[in-house]
Amino acid sequence: MMSRETASSEITPELLLRAYACGIFPMAESVDDPTLFWVEPKLRGVIPLESFRISSRLARTVRSDSFAVTVDTAFNAVIDGCAAPQPGRDNTWINRRIRELYIALHELGHCHSVEVWQGDELVGGLYGVRLGRAFFGESMFHIARDASKVALVHLVARLIAGGFVLLDTQFVTDHLRGFGAIEIPRRRYRALLDAALEGRADFAALPLDQPVPGTDALKIIADRA
């Protein structure tokens, strides 16, 4: 279901959080389109945390710590990276108003980024919204091979450690299917969302101010209950 919102300036961060709690989220047609529309997919993409999959090759990359991974240190740069054209994706739905809204959510503590670095260069990352025990993945990007995948592995380890129960990917791509992403009907999604909104999770269960070794992230995922 999609509903056109022509007065996107009227969407506030607080309204945005209420929308997520109802299972809907905003998008734009393109980076140049100033309007937003609400989306509630009939089939919702989720990655069940209990069945998150990592390939052997990616596990070796994570274990090697060849990338430095940080959290919430370069949120604006991550959303800009997600908005930039990439191979196979010439356009983006992240317009100026989307950028403003999610930066505001970040400043309120409800939106987080995972950054992946090679030296001083940001080469990948992701960002998403936290609400209750749910995390809503918004977008990811990479300019170095596996950088966004490494960000996702570290995110999942943090969610498991913090007691999250729902990782919402909104839609499912072939890329996400490799990690175990599935599509579920709207009614089932809403039941999972309602359960996730009850209780609290701790995004800071793993340190926010220092890197988490890749071996630790992999162990958390391997040892999940």
From Swiss-Prot:
Q: What is this protein called?
A: Leucyl/phenylalanyl-tRNA--protein transferase
Instruction: Just give the chief location class.
Output: cytoplasm
**Entries under InterPro entries matching the protein:** Acyl_CoA_acyltransferase, Leu/Phe-tRNA_Trfase, Leu/Phe-tRNA_Trfase_C, Leu/Phe-tRNA_Trfase_N
Q: Which family does it belong to?
A: Belongs to the L/F-transferase family.
- Keyword terms of this UniProt record: Acyltransferase, Cytoplasm, Transferase
Cited function: Functions in the N-end rule pathway of protein degradation where it conjugates Leu, Phe and, less efficiently, Met from aminoacyl-tRNAs to the N-termini of proteins containing an N-terminal arginine or lysine.
Per the UniProt record, which EC number(s) apply here? Answer: 2.3.2.6
Record's catalysed reaction(s): N-terminal L-lysyl-[protein] + L-leucyl-tRNA(Leu) = N-terminal L-leucyl-L-lysyl-[protein] + tRNA(Leu) + H(+); N-terminal L-arginyl-[protein] + L-leucyl-tRNA(Leu) = N-terminal L-leucyl-L-arginyl-[protein] + tRNA(Leu) + H(+); L-phenylalanyl-tRNA(Phe) + an N-terminal L-alpha-aminoacyl-[protein] = an N-terminal L-phenylalanyl-L-alpha-aminoacyl-[protein] + tRNA(Phe)
In the UniProt record, which is one GO cellular component term? cytoplasm
Per UniProt, subcellular location reads as: Cytoplasm
